[in-house]
Amino acid sequence: MEIDTLLGAFRDFEKKGEKESCPILDQFLSHVAKTGETMIQWSQFKSYFLFKLEKVMDDFKASCPEQRGPANPNVEYIPFEEMKQRILKIVNGYNGIPFTIQRLCELLTEPKRNYAGTDKFLRGVEKNVMVVSCVYPTSEKKGSSCVNRMNGVMFPGNTSAFPDRNVNGPGTPRPLNRPKHSLSSNVATNGLPDSTESKEQASEQSERTVNESSASEAESHSGAVKSKHRDDEDATHAETHEAKRLKFDKEEEEEEDDEEEDEDGDEIKKELDEPHSPCTSVAESSSDVPQSSTDVTAEVKDEDQEPSSTQSEVVENGVDRSTSEDSPDPSHKATGSESDPKEQQAEEEEEEESAEAQETEETNDPVSSSSNNSSDEGVSSAETPSASPSSSTELPAEGSVTAEITSDNSETADDNMEQD
């Protein structure tokens, strides 16, 4: 089929005042129904397509009367004239060839092939005309080998062959420059006229976007607040953990200080206890020494004196007294060990002075009896051991002094006996 003959036939149809069917144009519609190839522009065969569509609907109603049975409650009933005018208005608003052109041509060439009732036929036609995508005529693309088509729709990959044209029709905007709400903003650019329903949909979509944006902002704000609260909680947790750690360290330091103080107190007690033991040992040793000194004095007396009953008794009495006085009690040991060195020295000096005073008295009084001498000797010998626990270093010297004193006293006593 040649394009020139088709264009001439369409021009002749438009020039006629009375619209009639044309066999050449009907053959063109049958060719499109079989192949889906439109060789001319939409504006060139639009008028004949509208004429043929209206004629087919009228013929279908005339040949097929309306349904006499009860209407389907699930389907809205629309009168024939109203449905016909709606379909014609939609098709008249196209700016390009709809991508369902092949199916529409099938319905125009063979209307009773799939439909028996007028209502169902009109609904089928309405479903195929309510589209927004458009296609280009096939003859324009014969020179290109990279055309990708599916059901008459071009894909963006074909734009390289036609850089000066849009993908979905001459009246549609380019995909790169298309706004987010292109369908709701201007529906007529894609082949359908503007309507109140499209405007309502546009307003609803804009309200949804505003609500979504406000919700996202609220979520972001709440997320920021939550993150801030989390940071505050982390900071407070860290502070409490640090405070607990410092408190634990302080308690450990206090325990260590207490342990050190206890150790120092134990050492001080040990140091205080150590000096007492040598004192007691010295006191014990000194208590042993006087006994030996008294024994020496008793032996010296026995050797120097002559045998007499009075002297032996005196010596025995003196020895008994000295032994009784030489046995120091625990209280004496304790006092001697606890007395200071200065006090011990003072006591020793006093005892020495008293001993010297007794010696001078004995030498000056030759008339004194032997019994008195012996008693004095016993007293002096008893006094010397009592002072001996205070110092262990002077004990031997004191023992020698007492021995000399007793020897002198024994000589004076012998002289007195001879004189009597």
From Swiss-Prot:
Q: Where is the composition biased (Acidic residues)?
A: 251-266, 346-364, 411-420
Biased region (Polar residues) positions are: 182-195, 278-296
Which protein family is named in the record? Answer: Belongs to the PPP4R2 family.
Protein purpose: Regulatory subunit of serine/threonine-protein phosphatase 4 (PP4C).
Protein name (Swiss-Prot/TrEMBL): Serine/threonine-protein phosphatase 4 regulatory subunit 2-A
Give the gene symbol: ppp4r2a
Pfam (any one): PPP4R2
Source organism: Danio rerio (Zebrafish)
Q: Which is an annotated GO molecular function term of this record?
A: protein phosphatase regulator activity
How does this chain assemble?
A: Serine/threonine-protein phosphatase 4 (PP4) occurs in different assemblies of the catalytic and one or more regulatory subunits.
- A GO CC term assigned to this protein in UniProt: protein phosphatase 4 complex
For the region Disordered, what residue ranges are annotated?
157-420
Q: Where is the composition biased (Low complexity)?
A: 212-224, 368-394
InterPro entries from the xrefs?
A: PPP4R2
Which ranges are annotated Basic and acidic residues under compositional bias? 196-210, 229-250, 267-276, 318-332
